[in-house]
Amino acid sequence: MTSFASLGITEPILTALTDYGYAEPTVIQEKAIPAGIAGRDVLGSAQTGTGKTCAFGVPILQRLAQGGRGRTIRALILTPTRELAIQIDENLHAYGKNLPLTEAVIFGGVGQAPQVDQLKRGVDILTATPCLLYT
């Protein structure tokens, strides 16, 4: 049985995953996380509820935490719906709660001023719907 620690995940993220209730990685996580941490491209497919957000999110968080900080967007995640964008942002926030990274989510149908202000302050990870990102 594989553990999250055996996948090369750093302690701050391991602690957050444990706090979030994750005990052991799913198949998609076991295959994608080490490849993502190593900087390789990953194309994965898995059923709903198998932890795909963790599978791609943990490597993003770990690689960004190991690099320097800046005021520019360092990772961009595009999603087709606002609900999925919010869910991904909430999960990344939970997984990265012990890291000095910031994340934001932007989508249409709400006032843009708070979203623009957040981007001006600097964001490491941006999750967005394509339509609003374009505007």
How would you name each of these model-derived features?
Residues 1-45:
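Conserved pre-motif I regulatory segment
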Residues 34-38, 54-69, 93:
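Walker A/P-loop NTP-binding motif
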Residues 41-56:
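Walker A/P-loop
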Residues 7, 16, 20, 35-36, ...:
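Amphipathic alpha-helical segments that mediate coupling or scaffolding at interfaces
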Residues 26, 48-50, 81, 129:
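Conserved phosphate-coupling serine/threonine residues in phosphotransfer and NTP-handling enzymes
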Residues 30, 55-56, 76:
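Hydrophobic alpha-helical transmembrane segments of integral membrane proteins
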